[in-house]
Regions:
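Secondary-structure junction motif
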Residues: 195-229
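Hydrophobic two-helix hairpin corresponding to the core of helix-turn-helix DNA-binding domains
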Residues: 12, 24, 60-63, 252
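Alpha-helical linker/hinge and terminal dimerization helices associated
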Residues: 45-46, 66-94
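A late-sequence structural motif
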Residues: 113, 275-330
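Central regulatory/effector-binding core of bacterial HTH transcription factors
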Residues: 95-159
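Short helix-boundary/capping micro-motifs
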Residues: 13-31
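A short LG(V/I)-centered, amphipathic sequence patch enriched
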Residues: 43-62
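Hydrophobic hinge/microswitch elements
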Residues: 229-274
C-alpha cells in the first residue's frame, strides 16, 4: 500500500472534526478549493468515498479507518515531541493546532475532577481536545475512531483498546429549600407525624426534574432504583451543562440528580437540600484507551487514575449499580 500524504490525512480529519469544508479550510489556513482537492486526491488514492455529504458530514467506514490512522500519527508525533523536549527543550515549537490529542469525557467529570487531573499535561503543552457527552455514550467516540481515549460507564474493553476502573461518582437528588418546602412537603393527616420535605414515590411525577439532555438517564435511574420502580416517566427540563443544571436548580427550576462533588458545598451553605437523603446513586466510571505503547497515553492514563483515586469512591461496583446509604464523608475534588 502506498504512503498517505499526512497533509491530506489532516485535511480529512479537519473536515470531520470541524463539520464542513469551509471551517476545515479556516483551521488549516488554506482555501476551500484546496481542501476539496486534497480530499479528492485522498479518495482517488484509496479508491472509495471517504466523506458522506450529509448534514452533518460523516465519514464512511473507510474514512473512519483513515481518521483512526491520522490520530495514531498524531499520537506518535506527540510522543516524539515529548522525548525530544527532554533532550533539547528549545529545539521544538508548539504542536500544530490540527494535531490535537482528542479524548471524550462525560460532562460531570469535566465539571468536577477531570480538568484538575489534566492540568499539568496542559501546562506541559500537550495539545488536547476534550469532547463531552453523556457518560453512557462517550465510548461511541472511541469506537468510531474520533478519540484515542474516553471516560465512560462501559465496563468491557472495546476492540483494540484497554480499560481500567476509575471509581464511582456518587449522585444525589437536590433542590432549593424553598422548592422542597413548597413542592415536596407531605400533607399531614390526623395522627400523622410531620416529616421533612423529600422526594417520594408519591410525588416525583408532579415534580420537574432538570436533566442534561434527552440522553440523560440518571434522573430516571435514580428514581427507579430509589423506589423500586421498573418504569419511570419524569417531567423533565433540559440544560446541557453540568454547572448550569445546578444554577437552574438554585433558581428554583426543580429537582436534579447531580454529583455530590458539586452539591455538598452548596448544601453546607444552606443553598440546596438533599431531596432524597436516604439514597445515593454510585455510577462506576472506566478509562478506555487504545492498546498502544505510548508515553502520551501512559501520561493521560496516570493523570486520570491518580486524581480519580483521590475523589471517586474506590473499587469497581460488581453487578448492577445499587443505591447505597448516603456517606457524609465525601472526599472533595483536588485543587491544584
Amino acid at each position: 500500500m502506498s504512503t498517505f500524504d499526512p497533509d491530506a490525512l489532516e485535511c480529512l480529519a479537519a473536515i470531520v472534526e470541524e463539520g464542513g469544508f469551509e471551517r476545515a479550510a479556516q483551521r488549516l489556513s488554506i482555501t476551500q478549493s484546496a481542501v476539496s482537492q486534497r480530499l479528492r486526491a485522498l479518495e482517488s488514492q484509496v479508491g472509495t468515498v471517504l466523506i458522506v455529504r450529509s448534514r452533518p458530514l460523516k465519514p464512511t467506514s473507510a474514512g473512519q479507518l483513515l481518521l483512526k490512522h491520522t490520530k495514531m500519527l498524531r499520537l506518535l508525533r506527540a510522543d516524539l515531541e515529548r522525548d525530544l523536549k527532554e533532550l533539547a527543550p528549545s529545539s521544538l515549537g508548539g504542536a500544530r493546532e490540527e494535531e490535537r490529542i482528542s479524548i471524550a469525557i462525560n460532562a460531570d467529570s469535566i465539571a468536577t475532577w477531570a480538568l484538575p487531573a489534566l492540568s499539568e499535561l496542559a501546562r506541559q503543552g500537550l495539545p488536547m481536545e476534550i469532547i463531552h457527552d453523556d457518560q453512557n455514550f462517550t465510548h461511541e467516540w472511541l469506537r468510531e475512531g474520533h478519540v484515542l481515549g474516553c471516560v465512560t460507564t462501559l465496563k468491557q474493553a472495546l476492540r483494540g483498546c484497554k480499560v481500567e476502573p476509575l471509581g464511582a461518582m456518587q449522585y444525589i437528588a437536590v433542590a432549593t429549600p424553598d422548592f422542597a418546602q413548597n413542592r415536596l412537603a407531605l400533607p399531614c393527616g390526623t395522627g400523622d407525624r410531620p416529616t421533612a420535605p423529600a422526594l417520594t414515590q408519591h410525588n416525583f411525577r408532579d415534580v420537574p426534574f432538570v436533566a442534561f439532555n434527552r440522553k440523560d438517564e440518571l434522573p430516571s435511574e435514580f428514581v427507579g432504583k430509589a423506589f423500586g420502580l421498573k418504569r419511570v416517566t419524569l417531567n423533565q427540563l433540559f440544560v446541557p451543562s453540568s454547572q448550569d443544571m445546578v444554577r437552574a436548580v438554585l433558581a428554583g427550576w426543580g429537582v436534579s440528580v447531580v454529583p455530590r462533588l458539586m452539591a455538598d458545598a452548596l448544601i453546607e451553605q444552606g443553598l440546596l437540600v438533599n431531596a432524597a437523603p436516604a439514597y445515593t446513586l454510585p455510577i462506576q466510571l472506566y478509562w478506555h484507551c487504545w492498546n498502544l505503547e505510548s508515553e502520551v497515553l501512559d501520561a493521560l492514563s496516570a493523570a486520570l487514575r491518580q486524581t480519580a483515586a483521590a475523589v471517586l469512591v474506590a473499587g469497581p461496583v460488581s453487578g448492577p449499580t445499587q443505591l447505597i446509604p448516603e456517606n457524609p464523608q465525601v472526599r472533595q475534588v483536588l485543587t491544584r
